[in-house]
Structures are given as C-alpha cells and as structure tokens.
Amino acid sequence: NLFISNLDSIPIPDWSLLPELKKFYRPAGDSIKRSPSAGIVTSRGCDGKCYFCNPWQLGKMIRYHSAEYIYRMIVDLMRNHGIRDIYIQDDTFVINRDNVMQFCKILIEEKLDITWACHGRANHIDIDLLRAMKMAGCWQIAIGIESGSQKILDSINKGTTVEQNYKALKLCEEVGLDVKGLFMIGCFGESHETIKETIDFIKKVHITDFHMNFFTPLPLTSAIKLWPKYGHFDSSKGSFMGSTPSFIPFDLTEEELIYYHKYVYR
C-alpha cells in the first residue's frame, strides 16, 4: 500500500525547479546522441530476479507510465528546456512491449525531432519492436549481457541465455541500432574458462559501446547472502559501481581479475 499503482497520477516533473537543467543534469556522454540531453524514468520495478540486484526496492509489481504520459514529459523537455535527446533510464524499458509500441507510434505520428536511448533485456527484444523504436528516433539500446558463459548467467540467476543474447544483438545490427553491451566479471563460479567464453563472445558480436564492471555483492541483494559459497568478499573494497574488485571467486585471484578486466578493454 506504500507504492503508487497509477504512475500517471503523478504530475509531470517540474524541471524548472532545477538550476540550469541543460548544463548540470545530463546523462553520461556514452548515452547521448546530441546535446542538450536529459534523462527520464518511465517505470518502477523490474521483472528480473538477478542475484546482483534488488528490484523489490521499488515494489514487486512493475508499474508504468503510459505512452501518452511519456510523450508529454518529452514534449515539455523539448519546448521548455530545449532538450533534443532523451536517455530513458529504466532498468529495462522494453518489458512492456505494447506500451513501447504505442509510444513509438505517437512519436512517429507527431514527427518529434528527438533522439533517444534506453535499456533492455535480450529476452524482451524482437525485430518488429526494434524497427518501431528505430523509426521513432531510438539510436541505442543498452543490454545487460553480463557474461558469454551460460554457467555464469545461471549462477547469477540472470534469466537469459547466451543464445538469446546472440540473437538480440544480431537483430539490433540488422535494424541499425547501436548497442551498449553491459558485462560483469568475477561472478559466482567465474574461472579462467568462463572469462575466455565471455571474451570469445565479445569478439563475435555487434557491440558499439562496452562496459564491464566487477561483480559486487550489494546490500539487500541475494548475492550478499550467497557469496560465502563462491569466494571471498571484502566489503571495504570495491564500490557501488563495481569499478574495483571486492568479491574474488575461489578459482581466481584479485590480480587475475584485474588483468582480465584490463585485457578486455584493450
């Protein structure tokens, strides 16, 4: 009862309350097609049960703004703040396929001069959806691939397969969408062999941008309860963003994890 079920009942954000929106409140540069850009959130919750995340913080039921509400938010940002590019920051924007298709339809019909990027899961992506997104101004989709090893995907309860990831990336390439591939290293059960599987995967697929973080058991996640079965964890190390290793799987050393992380970025 603490959560708002109808997100459209919330007024559109009053961005004028923020000082110099265009200057200080913009997404990271790798998610921007053109400036000025702004980020928005169109839903709350996630249907994933990944061990490294805590989607229940925003409620177990996923709630969405309607396509019409999202459109009004974007129009307000364009007309009143000069925004030309939008970064949709939901964990996975494409879960509600019908809503995304309606959103794309509105943008196409209204001929908005806007570019946008979003996040998605491989198992929610299909060719018709991607084509509609592309026509509506989408230029990039960030996909949480995490690993090229099925063993690792299962160990973190990702709920996707290596084959689904291959297929989703191939469809994005076919449609002409840029892909930001999001990966983790040092997950439960990680080994030299599974890291090599991920490296081989990366070499084969269509990815135009790339991020790899160190797996980190965060508070209030399943990972924080499960890590003793899989390795060593020092909560004083690492960071919320996973930029340095804090969890070390039994089959690897901290130095080896850092080496592989640097190797992948070369």
Predicted regions and their residues:
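Short intrinsically disordered, low-complexity coil segments enriched in acidic
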Residues: 1-7, 182
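C-terminal accessory regions of radical SAM enzymes
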Residues: 3, 22, 193-266
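Short, solvent-exposed loop/helix junctions and linker helices
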Residues: 4, 64, 97, 158-162, ...
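Short catalytic/ligand-binding loop motif for oxyanion handling, primarily in non-cytosolic enzymes
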Residues: 6, 49, 95-97, 150, ...
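Radical SAM [4Fe-4S] cluster-binding motif and immediate context
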Residues: 15-182, 200
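Short, well-ordered beta-strand elements within core beta-sheets of diverse protein domains
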Residues: 41-43, 185-187, 247-252
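Short, solvent-exposed turn/loop segments enriched in Gly/Ser/Thr/Pro and often Arg
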Residues: 89-96, 121-122, 185-189, 213-222
